[in-house]
């Protein structure tokens, strides 16, 4: 195995059911085994799972319901607990804990909620817990639509700072035409950018239980690749597919990342106008510039301006020189209160904390 990597695995309804009307538990057992093997080798695994609606339908005995949002939410409300219970039972066989995260698109669009979701997800990973993520279908409205969990998996990959995103489906990958109706269709092994020509070959879901098709997987791949994350669309029934992806073995269709996640993030930080400014002491200046360290509250001398958590701020030395730009973990009022204090005092001063640093080194670019 190579060095530790973070992998987000999205499992569609067609994979979890095997195209039937019920969850294929034997197949899910095998997928969990593959994930557990990687987890034991030191890799960080995130699961984005579909199947709540299918699980609810199965549990209720396949009721005849109208094809409405309310019916889908009813089934999701019943099925979500059954689904997460299954994941918990199977991972516990390997002594692995899971943590459930139910998200909506609104969690991604609001800065504060985005940062909270990111911090929660990364805290789970840091503690060797496998996050299991799903759309909060029981309360979502417009979110229940084609491809929601495909796109959600791309956003989860960004939140996790993932190296790879694996979209498992009932197809081998992306083909030049629909292989179910065209025997001449060929597998596209490598993609270096999603364009209109590529979108035109994407087909639709045929399982009737899921909410995603190949076109939405292209959308997800496009988003992830632009964020610097390699994305693979592959068959969930291929033996050892998850391990193969982590080993770099060619499977399915690989969408090559356009830049590394860190490069993309630092490019954004460099270009964003600072929302405020902080001045730091000589010790903090040396730590950041010479050792590439994060900025701790202890090193902050003053805070200028009003800004929110998650905004880019300018960091200056005692002579007023602009030495770095970075994303603040705390808003301006909080930074004023904890400036000059040790990180261990943050919770006592604020009544909460978002970690021991004011600006993390991964969220900073020195000038």
UniProtKB/Swiss-Prot annotation:
The keyword Cytoplasm applies. Pfam families: AA_kinase, PUA. Residues 275-353 form the PUA domain. ATP binds at residues 10, 169-170, 211-217. Substrate binds at residues 50, 137, 149. GO terms for cellular component: cytosol. Gene3D superfamilies: Acetylglutamate kinase-like (3.40.1160.10), PUA domain (2.30.130.10). PANTHER family: GLUTAMATE 5-KINASE, ISOPENTENYL PHOSPHATE KINASE. Belongs to the glutamate 5-kinase family. This is Glutamate 5-kinase. It comes from Salmonella paratyphi A (strain AKU_12601). The lineage of its organism: Bacteria, Pseudomonadati, Pseudomonadota, Gammaproteobacteria, Enterobacterales. The gene is proB.
């Amino acid at each position: 195995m190579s060095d530790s990597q973070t992998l987000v695995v999205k499992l569609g309804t067609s994979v979890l059911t095997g195209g039937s009307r019920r969850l294929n538990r034997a197949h899910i057992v095998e997928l969990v085994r593959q994930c557990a093997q990687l987890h034991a080798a030191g890799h960080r695994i995130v699961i984005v799972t579909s199947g709540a609606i299918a699980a609810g339908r199965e549990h209720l005995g396949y009721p005849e319901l109208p094809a409405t949002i309310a019916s889908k939410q009813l089934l999701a409300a019943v099925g979500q607990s059954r689904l997460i219970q299954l994941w918990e039972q199977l991972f516990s066989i390997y002594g692995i804990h899971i943590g459930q995260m139910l998200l909506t698109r609104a969690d991604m669009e609001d800065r504060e909620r985005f940062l909270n979701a990111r911090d929660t997800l990364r805290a789970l990973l840091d503690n060797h817990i496998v996050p299991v993520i799903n759309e909060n279908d029981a309360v979502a409205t417009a979110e229940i639509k084609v491809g929601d969990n495909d796109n959600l998996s791309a956003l989860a990959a960004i939140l996790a700072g993932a190296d790879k995103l694996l979209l498992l489906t009932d197809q081998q990958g992306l083909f030049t035409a629909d292989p179910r109706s065209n025997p001449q269709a060929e597998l596209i092994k490598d993609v270096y950018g999603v364009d209109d020509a590529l979108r035109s070959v994407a087909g639709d879901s045929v399982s009737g239980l899921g909410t995603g098709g190949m076109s939405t997987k292209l959308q997800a791949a496009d988003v992830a690749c632009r964020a610097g994350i390699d994305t693979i669309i592959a068959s969930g029934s291929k033996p050892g597919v998850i391990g193969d992806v982590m080993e770099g073995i060619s499977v399915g269709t690989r969408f090559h990342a356009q830049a590394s996640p860190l490069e993309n993030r630092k490019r954004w930080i460099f270009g964003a106008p600072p929302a405020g400014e902080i001045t730091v002491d000589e010790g903090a200046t040396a730590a950041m510039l010479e050792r590439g360290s994060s900025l701790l509250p202890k090193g902050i001398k003053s805070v200028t301006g009003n800004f929110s958590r998650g905004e880019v701020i300018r960091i200056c030395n005692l002579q007023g020189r602009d030495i770095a730009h970075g994303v603040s973990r705390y808003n301006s009022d909080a930074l004023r209160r904890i400036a000059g204090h040790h990180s261990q005092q943050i919770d006592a001063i604020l009544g909460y904390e978002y970690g021991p640093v004011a600006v993390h080194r991964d969220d900073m670019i020195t000038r």
